[in-house]
Amino acid sequence: MGLNFFMSRKIYYIKLLTGLYKKFIKALIVKKNESNNAYLLVETANFYNLVFSLQRSSLTQFKVLNDVCIVDYPEKIDRFELSYNLSSIKYNFRIFIKTYTSAYVPSISTLFNSANWIERECWDMFGVFFTNHPDLRRILTDYGFEGFPLRKDFPLTGYIEIRYDDEKANIVYEPLELSQEYRLFNFTSPWEKIK
C-alpha cells in the first residue's frame, strides 16, 4: 500500500464526512499537502450537534480531543475563532472544526473529559463563555483578576499591580496609574521593503 492509496483513502473519508454532516457544515476546506487535513467551518448553533455526531457515529469515531485554539479578531463582529482539533484513532484521521463567536459556545466537556480544563483556560484568558460547562471558573489567573489577558484590547500593563508588602506581611493589590492607548499595529515593519 503506497502513499497514493493512503491519500485517496483520506480524500474518500473527507467526502464521506461532508455527505454525512452537510446540514451542520457551513464550509469545508481541505489543505492540499502531505496531511490533507480537513477544516470544517460550523455555525455556533450547530457546533455541539456536529461534535456529538462525529464522536458517537461508528463511521467517524472521533474519540480524542487534542486541543482547542482561540484567535482574537477584535475588528470582526464574531471576534473569536475557535479551532477544535479532533482525532479518530480507528480511522487514523484528524479533523479541525472551526467556529466563530462573540460571546458563547456550547461546552463539549460532557463529550470529552479533556475539554473541561481547556474550556476553563479559554474562559480565563479570552472570556469566551461555554454554556452548560460544569465548573467554569478561572484556572490560571487569580480569582479576583479583572479582564481577560489574551484579548488584544487588554492593556499590556494590566489594571492592578499585585505585590508582597514586607511591612504588612501580606499581598497588596494596587490600581495602576499608567496610561496606555489602544495598541494599533499600523506601522511599517523594518523587515519589509519600503516602496
From Swiss-Prot:
One annotated GO molecular function is: NADH dehydrogenase (ubiquinone) activity
- What Pfam families does its record include? Complex1_30kDa
Cross-referenced InterPro entries, in alphabetical order? Answer: NADH_DH_suC, NADH_quin_OxRdtase_su_C/D-like, NADH_UbQ_OxRdtase_30kDa_su, NADH_UbQ_OxRdtase_CS
Keywords assigned by UniProt, alphabetized: Electron transport, Membrane, Mitochondrion, Mitochondrion inner membrane, NAD, Oxidoreductase, Respiratory chain, Translocase, Transport, Ubiquinone
Q: Which GO terms describe its cellular component?
A: mitochondrial inner membrane
Q: Which reaction does it catalyse?
A: a ubiquinone + NADH + 5 H(+)(in) = a ubiquinol + NAD(+) + 4 H(+)(out)
E.C. numbers: 7.1.1.2
Q: Does the keyword Translocase apply?
A: yes
Q: Which domain of life is it from?
A: Eukaryota
Q: Where in the cell is it found?
A: Mitochondrion inner membrane
Enzyme group, top EC level? translocase
Self-association and partners: Complex I is composed of about 30 different subunits.
Function field: Core subunit of the mitochondrial membrane respiratory chain NADH dehydrogenase (Complex I) that is believed to belong to the minimal assembly required for catalysis. Complex I functions in the transfer of electrons from NADH to the respiratory chain. The immediate electron acceptor for the enzyme is believed to be ubiquinone.
> Hey, which family's this protein in?
Belongs to the complex I 30 kDa subunit family.
Designated name of the protein:
NADH-ubiquinone oxidoreductase subunit 9
